[in-house]
Amino acid sequence: AVKTKKIMLGFGILELPLHNPVRVAIQTALLDNLSQGRLVVGTGRGSNYNAYEYVGFGTTTGLGAAQLDEAEELLVKAWTEDNVTFKGQFFDVSFPSVRPRPYQKPHPPLARACTSDASLVEMAKIGRPVLIRGNSINATGEKIKLYRDTMSAAGFSEEDVEKSLDQLWVWREMHIAETNDEAMNDFLPAHYKAYEHLEGVRAKWNPPEMDISIQRAPLGPSDYVEAPNPDISESMVGSYKRVAEQVALMRDAGVRNLMLTNRGLVSTEKTKKSLTLLSEKIMPSFH
């Protein structure tokens, strides 16, 4: 945070039902000051794929939505108010203030992870930034249009709508190499292995009595053809030319910000090469 000057810092996501929101307020306020206002705080209930995480913290996924709403309310109060007394269903706290206050006023962007259209509409109605994941490019564009239209219908000004769209982030897995074949050979086996590991942990630890979601299996190698397909949920994988085409398609669909990760066990050397290609071959065309 201190050594960098331009890069944004963020959480994608903090599963707030599994955290103490006052501690989160203290830690994020400090980080926002150290970075001089480059922090985005992404929050969410977490995934029903990983219900075992809730069990590990002594709670259940069924309480997650209510815990998230209450934790976010307390987080904002801790960031912005003095002499806080909060009595909720899950948190009962009193404290004089959080110091330092966040660098950004009134507080860092608080973006909610949204999977369903219903949760997206809920956030749009109150002008909250959102994080979107796991859709095709065309479906992502439809979600962004829904978000924009809902904010406008709720009475927000065009300036407010544009500000929220500037803080809307879309998550994708990414790996770039010199050629499509090289990128696929680097990324896909590691990606599938990571998926199999997660499925194994879930099968062993997820409690059967909880509401468990089944994660869709990743696309197979034959789904990745020479040109990107905006109608399927493909990762951003390929040569820098192919990935640049994907970025252009996402830009045209209304995407302004991307969160790019690589959760497979790709080597450090190849991951660094991927990031270098991103910064040198792709990013200059989209600034």
Language model regions located:
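Active-site mouth loops of central-metabolism enzymes
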Residues: 12-22, 104-115, 174-177, 229-241
